[in-house]
């Protein structure tokens, strides 16, 4: 059978590494051929975190990081190919998400900015790169996010089955697949892992709360939870999208200023509940019952999954592996899929999801030649 090899590159708001996946799209379902995660070096991570907040000398820092992130993404590709022993000329294209450093779609002139120079990736891998997927949607009046619902629709939708696909990265987003002729919907619910990771990093110097064990040892403070949930984002109507611009360490410190008496683990438990409650509220607005399939890093947090299940008694909950897609690599696969859509000249946004005025072919090609 012919092969249709694409590589997907993803680094999300969690900034916990660059995921590189090699996918074959020749069959009906995407087939995952190989995976690799490239760790983001500490100096680069600190530079990126700093760039996500307004500061001085931004353009110089942006320019340097754009190239450095491009080199890191290229390294991820080259290591993936070495691992899978597949030659670069067998790859049709790389789909690169880049690293988001600003996402401001709701300004009078909205914009989004991802860095990781695709020219650098193309020249250092010898493979054409499809990148800059979000800005066409914004040019058409959309949010530029989330982009994965179109992939979810094609891969996970089934007639007669009401399904919600929940991706929990730094930010959490949901795709509602009604299983009938109703529109597919999708939007960011709010924080996923970003605040629980930030707090465990600040207090315990650990990169994440494994299995939610630290949160499980604490007790949620109802007053703090109510205050966090009063953030205006949670009551916005969709289409909506968010990022570190709204939910970051500075915002968290501001929220915690009146709660100095709380134990650190109680704060962690409350932050985990913020993620779970904001997700559950949005899911219940769409449908009281159905099937929920989780992907992204949050799928591996046992305490999070347990709390979600308690808030959504009408849902059968599993990870996307039950549908044949490894939850760790689902987003990387989605960006390989977006590259394929560009290659085939097919649209990849869902206007009902992003708010764009029409469907569009997303991205641009950066040739290796």
Curated annotation (Swiss-Prot):
CDD domains listed in its UniProt record? ASKHA_NBD_ANMK (cd24050)
Gene Ontology terms, MF aspect: ATP binding; kinase activity; phosphotransferase activity, alcohol group as acceptor
Q: Which reaction does it catalyse?
A: 1,6-anhydro-N-acetyl-beta-muramate + ATP + H2O = N-acetyl-D-muramate 6-phosphate + ADP + H(+)
Any Pfam family the entry gives: AnmK
**EC top class, in one word?**
transferase
Residues annotated as binding ATP are 12-19
Q: Locate the transmembrane regions by residue number.
A: none
Q: What is this protein called?
A: Anhydro-N-acetylmuramic acid kinase
Organism in which the protein naturally occurs: Shewanella oneidensis (strain ATCC 700550 / JCM 31522 / CIP 106686 / LMG 19005 / NCIMB 14063 / MR-1)
């Amino acid at each position: 059978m012919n092969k249709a090899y694409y590589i997907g590159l993803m680094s999300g708001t969690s900034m916990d590494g660059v995921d590189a996946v090699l996918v074959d799209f020749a069959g009906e379902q995407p087939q995952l051929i190989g995976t690799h995660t490239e760790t983001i070096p500490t100096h680069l991570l600190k530079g990126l975190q700093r760039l996500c907040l307004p500061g001085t000398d931004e353009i110089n820092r942006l320019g340097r990081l754009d190239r450095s992130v491009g080199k890191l993404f290229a390294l991820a590709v080259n290591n993936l190919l070495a691992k899978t022993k597949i030659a670069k000329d067998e790859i049709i294209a790389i789909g690169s998400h880049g690293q988001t450093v600003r996402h401001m779609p709701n300004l009078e002139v909205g914009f989004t900015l991802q860095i990781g120079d695709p020219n650098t990736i193309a020249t250092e891998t010898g493979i054409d790169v499809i990148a800059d997927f979000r800005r066409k949607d914004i040019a058409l009046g959309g949010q530029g996010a989330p982009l994965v619902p179109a992939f979810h629709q094609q891969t996970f939708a089934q007639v007669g089955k009401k399904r919600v696909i929940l991706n929990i990265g730094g930010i959490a987003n949901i795709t509602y697949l009604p299983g009938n002729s109703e529109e597919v919907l999708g939007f960011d619910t709010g924080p996923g892992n970003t605040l629980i990771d930030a707090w465990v990093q600040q207090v315990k110097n650990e990169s994440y709360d494994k299995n939610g064990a630290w949160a499980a040892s604490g007790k949620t403070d109802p007053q703090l939870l109510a205050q966090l949930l009063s953030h205006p984002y949670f009551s916005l109507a969709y289409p909506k999208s968010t990022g570190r611009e709204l939910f970051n360490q500075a915002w968290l410190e501001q929220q915690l200023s009146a709660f100095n008496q709380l134990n650190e683990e109680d704060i962690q438990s409350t932050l985990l509940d913020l993620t779970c409650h904001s997700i559950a509220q949005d899911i219940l607005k769409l449908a009281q019952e159905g099937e929920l399939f989780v992907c992204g890093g949050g799928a591996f947090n046992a305490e999070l999954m347990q709390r979600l299940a308690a808030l959504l008694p009408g849902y059968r909950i599993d990870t996307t592996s039950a549908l044949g897609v490894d939850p760790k690599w689902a987003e990387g696969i989605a960006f390989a899929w977006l590259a394929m859509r560009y290659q085939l000249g097919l649209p990849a946004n869902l206007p009902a999801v992003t708010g764009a005025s029409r469907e569009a072919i997303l991205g641009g090609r950066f040739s290796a030649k």
